[in-house]
Structure formats: structure tokens, C-alpha cells
């Protein structure tokens, strides 16, 4: 949000390029950023200043600079958290949020920055552990939904890059579905890279199950 407050997308590009160069010098080749969530819910406990703003146009404009800058700095990047974490009042690290709005509203607000990021050449997209009943009414979060990952993101939106999950140890998955079951469901949904960020033993169990 601070970068968007400069009013200068070129500053965002330069910040991304410098960040990319510094990460690459340390041996890091993939930065799991930027967030292209639209911070449209004042009660949102987790996105806040991670977002570039409260309108799709603002988010898309400044995310484009960061996406270009990070890649010019020599690292991969991604857009997150698909289809959007901006309009939640719950934190998916702690529980399972739901964005219950019609498809046309999702198109105007949540999906617009992702469509822009795809057009801008973002190489990867991270999925959200959030329910979107208008996109999939089966009761599984986006990360575990074939309708959302393969049907919407790959099919309708034409994304051909890498699809990653958010961490499968977050409570939105672990508490309601189990991390190992979540990993299998995410892979079946079409997720390419499944993240288990904390527990070595759990990572091993998931790898064996897969």
C-alpha cells in the first residue's frame, strides 16, 4: 500500500527490481509476491497494507510494476491469493473464510486484477484457502476446487503458468479437511506446486500419500 501511495508505478517497478536483485544475490529465485487482493473490506484482518489499494484498477496498475520489476531483477514472482482474499472478515491462517457474492461482483472486484496480471505476464498464481460459493458450491476452498483452478483459472482465464497453493498447514485446510487430504485434493484440482511450510514430518506424509 505504501508503494501505491507514492502515486508512481515506476517507483513500484524499481522497488521490485531492487528486491529481485537482492533476493537473487542471496540465492533466492522465487518471491511469493505480490498480493493482488483488493482491500475492499475494512474488517479484513490479514490483507490490509499487503494490498496496493481498495479498487481493482489501483491494484492492477501497481502490481504490474512489481511483477515486471521482480522478473527484471532476476526472480520469479506470483500473483496471490486467487480468486481474491480482499473481501473477507476472517484470516485463512486461522479458519476458513467465505466470500459469498455473485459471479458478476467477483468479476468486477476480485478477478479483475488477476486477469490484468495474466495479461502482464505473471509467471505464477497462488490459490486461496477460501470458499467461493458462486464459483464452486461443493464446499471446498479454491485451492481444492477443480472448478476454480482448472475450470476458471486455466480454462476461462487462459492462464498457462505455474499454479501454487498457499500453505496447506494453514487452519483453513488443516482444521477442516486435514493437510494431507488437502494436498491430494489440491493436486487433483490442478495445483502444480503444493506448499507445506512448517512441519517436515507432515511434508513427508503428504509426499507418501501423493
Roles of regions detected by a PLM:
Residues 1-7, 51-53:
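A charged helix-plus-loop insertion that forms the helical arch/lid used to bind
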Residues 5-8, 12, 106, 175-176:
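Alpha-helix N-cap/helix-initiation motif
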Residues 13, 17, 45, 50, ...:
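Generic detector of intrinsically disordered, low-complexity, polar/charged segments
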Residues 54-210:
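Second-shell residues forming the walls of enzyme active-site clefts
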Residues 1, 41-48:
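Acidic/polar active-site rim loop that often engages polyanionic ligands
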Amino acid at each position: 500500500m505504501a508503494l501505491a501511495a507514492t502515486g508512481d508505478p515506476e517507483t513500484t517497478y524499481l522497488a521490485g527490481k531492487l528486491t529481485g536483485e537482492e533476493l537473487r544475490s542471496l540465492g533466492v529465485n522465487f518471491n511469493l509476491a505480490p498480493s493482488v487482493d483488493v482491500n475492499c473490506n475494512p474488517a479484513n484482518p490479514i490483507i490490509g497494507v499487503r494490498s496496493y489499494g481498495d479498487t481493482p484498477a489501483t491494484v492492477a496498475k501497481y502490481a504490474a510494476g512489481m511483477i515486471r520489476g521482480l522478473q527484471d531483477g532476476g526472480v520469479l514472482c506470483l500473483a496471490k491469493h486467487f480468486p481474491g482474499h480482499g473481501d473477507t472478515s476472517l484470516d485463512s491462517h486461522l479458519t476458513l473464510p467465505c466470500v459469498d457474492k455473485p459471479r458478476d461482483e467477483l468479476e468486477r472486484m476480485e478477478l479483475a486484477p488477476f486477469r490484468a496480471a495474466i495479461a502482464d505476464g505473471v509467471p505464477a498464481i497462488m490459490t486461496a484457502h477460501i470458499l467461493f460459493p458462486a464459483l464452486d458450491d461443493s464446499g471446498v476452498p479454491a485451492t481444492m476446487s477443480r472448478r476454480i483452478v482448472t475450470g476458471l483459472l486455466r480454462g476461462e482465464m487462459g492462464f498457462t503458468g505455474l499454479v501454487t497453493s498457499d500453505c496447506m498447514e494453514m487452519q483453513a485446510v488443516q482444521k477442516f479437511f486435514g493437510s494431507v487430504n488437502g494436498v491430494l485434493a489440491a493436486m487433483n484440482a490442478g495445483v502444480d506446486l503444493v506448499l507445506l511450510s512448517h512441519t517436515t514430518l507432515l511434508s513427508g506424509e503428504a509426499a507418501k500419500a501423493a
